[in-house]
Every structure is written in C-alpha cells, then in structure tokens.
Amino acid sequence: MKKETITAAAVLCALGAGFLACVLHTDQPLSLSERRPLAQRPEVSVQALASGNYMSEFETYALDQFPLREAMRQLKAQVQYYLLRQKDNNGVYQVDGSLSKIEAVLSESSVRAAAEKLNRLQETYLTDSRVFYGVVPDKNYYLAEENGYPHLDYERMDAILAEGLPHMERIDLYDCLSAEDYYKTDPHWRQEELEKAAGRVAQALGVSIAPFSDYTQETYQDFRGAYYGQSALPLKAEPLHYLTSEALEACTVHHYETGADTGVYETEKLAGKDPYDVFLGGADALETITNPNAKTDRELLVFRDSFGSSLAPLLVQDYQSVTLIDLRYVSAQLLEQFIDFHGQDVLFLYSPSVY
C-alpha cells in the first residue's frame, strides 16, 4: 500500500510539474532551429468549438509550444541515429559530421519544363546576349552514393538540360567542388571555397576574378544552418566566412522591391534566423550590384537561386553591373519593366532542386 501511495504521489507530482511548466511557459513566436513560425494559442469561439477546428488548432498549438519540445526533438533524433541506427531523421542524414537531405527522385518533366522556361526567356529577351547555364551540384552529389544513400540521377538531368538548351553554353562545375566546400549544417556552398568554381564561371564568360589572396576573410562563429534544425541533432555551431576587399566595399546593391541601397554584405543579418542572408541580404526578386571601379563597361545578368548570393560578389571585378534575378519571386513577364535588355552577358545558375 505504501509503495502504491508513493507511486501515485510521484505521478501526481510529475503531472503537476508538467502543468505548472505549461502555465509558466511563455509562448514563442518561432522556432529558430527549424526556421518556422510556431502555432499560437487559438481564439475560443462558438463557431470554432462547434466545427471542431478549435481542438485541432489547440492540439497543434500544444505540440508547438510544449516546454520541453526542443529537448524531446533532440532525444528522438539521437535515439534514431545512435540507438536504433537509422540512416536518417526527417530525411536528413549525417556523414562525418556533415548533414545533407535525401533527394532521390528526379522529376524529368520538371527539368524539361525548366528548360522550356529558360528557352522562352532567351527567345523573348536575350537574343542579342551570350547565354550560359550551369548546375550548382548539391552536397548529395559528393556524399550520397559512396555512403549508401539514394540520390538524383545527375547524368540524366544534365542530358535533359543539354537537349533542351541547345543554344546555351554549359558551364560544368561538378569537378570544381567537394563535400568539404559546403557548410556542415546547411545545403549551401562556402564562399571562401569557391575560387575554382568562380574561376570556371569567369573563364566561360571571358572575364577575370580577383585572386582570393586579395580578400580579407571576415568570420561569424555561430552559424547553424537549415539542416541543423531539421536533423534535431545537438551539433556544434560552425564558422561562416565572407570575403571582403576595398573593391567590394565600394560596390552598392540596389534592391528593386524595397528601393533600398545596401552594401554587398548585410552584416545585421548575421543575428537573424538565417545568417546566410548576409550575402546580398538573402532572398530577393531583383537586385543589381554596381561596381564603380569595374575594369570594363560590360554587364552581367544572373538568373539564380540562393547559391548565387555568395557567388555573385566574386564575379564583379570586370563588370560594371551584375543584376541578379530570382524567378521564384518575380514573374518573367514583368522583367522588361525593370531591366533594359541590350546584349548583356547572361548566366542561368541553379541547384538541382530548382531545375
């Protein structure tokens, strides 16, 4: 009887402690590790109660705002990885401390559709331009196959693009990179490791890049990338480096959406939810880097995804301006309202997830 009383008291104490923690816990607006907003307490109404929506929304809210939620996510991930020996958690796997996300299914129809879209852009705006395209290899290209993980059929993707883009010149970047050239906790490549890749792009375009020895390397020490939160593993932060020089400091970036003019690096973004946004301020539909000290009067248009943010500053040396266009955020039909197409060099540069 005494043992049962002690057990019951322990259970009641645990429940009481849990209830007290929930009461005292302050609701958080977002999860920094997952980089997403958290559900907030739903409003009570007769309509919401009658429809059942309130309980459904409250369940989501309770799961998001559970006081020990982050600790439980980490515990689950460690059990799956290290105790149960599962090869991934939430689709994220780990090889020698580097995280990557499984992407195994190549949508050939999507690749063909992307090629058709690029062709339409070339026919509409770029008939007087030299046009190049390249694929930014994802980290899986260097990690997945040799470590037993499924991966995209990169050769098939390249073949579809080559067939679909007959009037563009391909820039091959696969042999310019390795797994070590990417952040351990993020899908993006590391700017300080792009000398070979940037040189390959510049060579194709017929321009030069500044030697990396000319740059000063600035460092943010507390970078935790997108895969850090998705994996839920308690990994150490890693450094994020960005390259500066007097030439880059003289450049300005015009953001068409806001009308703001900034520097190439927006260092205040380092304190935000995604420090990678330090490169050109992060996601932006349309922006132009102006270089007052350019060695030529040439101009470059880069149709890109987020990988282009850290590469573009390395290409400005010979260009009077470099305009970056992200078609995920602006319709191609609106481009001529902002850009005077007159034979600029053109580069389409996307990672496999966009193609």
Annotate each predicted stretch with a short phrase.
Residues 1-355:
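Extracellular glycan-modifying ectodomains
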